[in-house]
């Protein structure tokens, strides 16, 4: 509200970045790939495993929910999804536990799913919640996050003028790998961060949700005549 007519919010997918209304080449594009704290803490969105809510996880108006994937995917496909998008190395154990649970009753809430995963994997005192990788995988799949990112990066570069910069904040290695390759392989860019910048210990202590953040930047260069 404090920026007046200097700021316009447009609700679109990353892959629709090329449809942005601009009066000329952009000076910079910032991608923040994280789920906002407001989304995580809002039970009705179904992103988090710490508060109960419907197993939804849609960021927009997509048709498929996390509950649809959990209850309708064949067990083997669910295991592959958890391994690929959540990097869950015990994905088959989790998928088998979900398969048994959904035979008894449809899994409709975040609390139900978190409980099933915790029962299958156990919990380490002081360790991260055992369901975090499962929830990550489902959120990525529901919103097609990796496809959106891979599609949108080259489109964003095309909007930049010479000297314009594209900056990306990613939060897990799957995202970071896509960004690293996109920057490296695009001959319109000069990479500014040979290695990603990461939060200091002080920042991690102040904002634990930033602990896995990685910052990469690249600059649009003049194209050859």
Language-model features: locations:
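S-adenosyl-L-methionine-dependent methyltransferase catalytic core, i.e., the SAM/SAH-binding region
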Residues: 1-225
């Amino acid at each position: 509200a404090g920026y007046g007519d200097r700021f316009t919010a447009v609700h679109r997918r990353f892959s629709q970045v090329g449809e942005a209304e601009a009066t000329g080449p952009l000076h910079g594009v910032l991608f923040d790939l994280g789920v906002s704290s407001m989304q995580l803490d809002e039970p009705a969105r179904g992103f988090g495993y710490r508060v109960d809510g419907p197993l939804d996880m849609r960021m927009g108006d997509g048709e498929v929910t996390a509950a649809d994937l959990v209850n309708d995917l064949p067990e083997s496909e669910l295991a592959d999804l958890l391994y690929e998008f959540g990097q869950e190395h015990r994905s088959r154990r989790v998928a088998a536990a979900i398969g048994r649970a959904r035979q008894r009753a449809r899994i409709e809430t975040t609390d139900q799913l978190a409980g099933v995963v915790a029962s299958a994997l156990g919990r380490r005192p002081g360790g991260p919640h055992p369901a975090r990788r499962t929830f990550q995988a489902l959120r990525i799949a529901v919103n097609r996050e990796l496809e959106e990112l891979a599609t949108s990066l080259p489109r964003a570069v095309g909007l930049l003028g010479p000297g314009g910069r594209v900056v990306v904040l990613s939060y897990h290695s799957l995202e970071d790998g896509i960004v690293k390759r996109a920057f490296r392989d695009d001959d319109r860019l000069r990479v500014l961060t040979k290695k990603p910048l990461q939060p200091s210990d002080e920042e991690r202590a102040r904002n634990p949700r930033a602990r896995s953040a990685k910052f990469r930047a690249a600059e649009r260069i003049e194209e050859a005549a």
